[in-house]
């Protein structure tokens, strides 16, 4: 512990975010990092607890507490404080394949479990992580490190999201010959087309992919395995196959008028915007536009917030975000004690921007759509909303949200974006390989394992565990790499 009194001497300081009315003028990342001197003070705030909950990654009441990757947080916090950036990077890379991604998009369960947060502000772990990886790129330490020895084993990874990339990275480090197949035109999966550019600039993904290419990983794009690329061919040519296709089957809503023109899944809205942005800076018009439209976003999660921020950048006339559940409290309640994930109200960047542009929070709680109304041509013109209340089911005893009769109200709507989560993987890939699915439509495996019912076929990420965080996907990718390595070699020395 470099500075035992650091948490007493220094307050938490965050990097500055551009003002909402400025940052909505483009799709660029908008956070300015701290100076090196400021960052070192933040590293000094780490208490190096006897039991560092920040790296625990344990499930508590259905939510993760601490980092699922078990990052060596106290160690690299102390190294940041002492200015040993190279050593900090080496400690960080021991557990995290992609700190350049997690330091931008992770909700930081490590900080929620930080002991400093018991009586004050937690250590700025996420910003320290960001500083470490960016410094490593500046100094060249994050550059290519090809394996010194190669095996004769060939592995196909289907999907280039965080889980597939993590598996490929680890297996390549072991010396295996890895080919990643991606159905889209660009590598990155969820990272590329599911997360807006202002949260994760796509050049950051390309930077890492280029490093992986130089280290020996092969990438094949526009390879839609199960459709234009035969599963049988892969099973014949490769010693092992890893299915990491994500949970890309969006949850729909059953509402009268759902077939109206102007209702889309959030993932299609976000993907089309990013693709057009990268191809033409939105000049080709090949995207779902929210310009001058009254937008309704159904869903209160991160994807819903991304839709709000994206619609505002398009120049929407208004934006409303519907949340079925009640508004969360400002502070932890007695039944949500530390180190559980704090179930408290958070105003994210998209909501901040809506407040700045329209003068009010876009979120309406305990509300859903009762009906969509379309004109004679089939175009959406308005939505009928209805309030919800919590009610206990007399048969099951479970609480659920039910409509409040007589609470209906009409609102104008030209564009509706459904951000209601995902049901699981699209089944055609699993069908092509003959792997079994479980009741949740995820690929079935034994508990804690990654092997499917088909010989030499493994699975990981959201396709395996269901919709989750990027950090969980990386965790799964690293774990499946160990299982594949042991399957091929009889043992594994992967961490």
Where are these regions (language model features)?
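A conserved FAD-binding loop/helix module that cradles the flavin
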Residues: 304-307, 314, 463-494
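Glycine-rich Rossmann-fold phosphate-binding loop(s) that bind the pyrophosphate
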Residues: 159-162, 299-301, 462
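C-terminal catalytic lobe of FAD-dependent flavoproteins
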Residues: 13-37, 42-45, 365-367, 373-374, ...
């Amino acid at each position: 512990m470099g500075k035992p009194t650091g948490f007493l001497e220094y307050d938490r300081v965050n990097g500055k975010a551009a003002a909402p009315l400025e940052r909505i003028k483009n799709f660029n990342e908008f956070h300015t990092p701290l100076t090196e001197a400021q960052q070192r003070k933040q590293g000094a705030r780490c208490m190096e607890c006897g039991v560092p909950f920040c790296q625990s990654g344990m499930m508590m009441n259905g939510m993760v507490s601490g980092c699922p990757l078990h990052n060596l947080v106290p160690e690299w916090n102390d190294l940041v404080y002492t200015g040993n950036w190279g050593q900090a990077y080496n400690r960080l890379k021991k557990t995290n394949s992609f700190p350049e991604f997690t330091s931008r998009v992770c909700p930081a369960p490590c900080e929620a479990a930080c002991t400093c947060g018991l009586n004050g502000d937690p250590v700025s772990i996420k910003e320290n992580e960001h500083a470490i990886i960016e410094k490593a790129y500046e100094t060249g330490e994050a550059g290519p490190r090809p394996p010194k020895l190669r095996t004769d084993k060939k592995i196909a990874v289907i999907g280039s999201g965080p889980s597939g990339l993590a598996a490929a990275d680890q297996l390549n480090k072991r010396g295996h010959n890895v080919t990643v197949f991606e159905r889209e035109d660009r590598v990155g999966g969820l990272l590329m087309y599911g997360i807006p550019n202002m949260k994760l600039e796509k050049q950051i993904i390309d930077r890492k992919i280029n490093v992986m290419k130089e280290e020996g990983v092969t990438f094949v794009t526009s390879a839609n395995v199960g459709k234009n690329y035969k599963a049988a061919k892969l099973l014949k040519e490769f010693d092992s196959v890893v299915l990491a296709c994500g949970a890309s089957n969006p949850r729909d809503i059953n509402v009268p008028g759902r077939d109206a023109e102007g209702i889309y899944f959030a993932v299609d809205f976000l993907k089309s915007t990013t693709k057009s942005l990268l191809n033409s800076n939105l000049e080709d018009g090949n995207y779902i536009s929210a310009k001058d439209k009254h937008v309704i976003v159904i869903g209160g999660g991160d994807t819903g917030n991304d839709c709000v921020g994206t619609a505002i950048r398009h120049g929407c006339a208004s934006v409303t975000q519907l949340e079925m559940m009640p508004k969360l409290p400002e502070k932890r309640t007695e039944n949500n004690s530390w180190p559980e994930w704090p179930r408290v109200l958070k105003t994210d960047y998209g909501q901040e921007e809506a407040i700045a542009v329209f003068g009010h929070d876009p979120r309406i709680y305990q509300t859903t759509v009762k009906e969509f109304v379309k004109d004679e041509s089939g175009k959406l013109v308005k939505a009928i909303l209805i309030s919800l209340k919590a009610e206990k089911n007399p048969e099951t005893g479970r609480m659920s949200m039910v409509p409040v009769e007589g609470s209906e109200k009409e609102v104008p709507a030209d564009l509706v974006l459904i951000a209601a989560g995902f049901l699981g993987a699209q089944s055609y890939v699993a069908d092509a390989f003959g792997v079994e699915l479980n009741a949740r439509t995820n690929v079935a495996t034994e508990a804690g394992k990654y092997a499917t019912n088909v010989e030499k076929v493994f699975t990981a990420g959201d396709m395996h565990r269901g919709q989750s965080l990027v950090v969980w996907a990386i965790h799964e990718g690293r774990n499946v790499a160990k299982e594949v390595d042991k399957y091929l070699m009889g043992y594994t020395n992967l961490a």
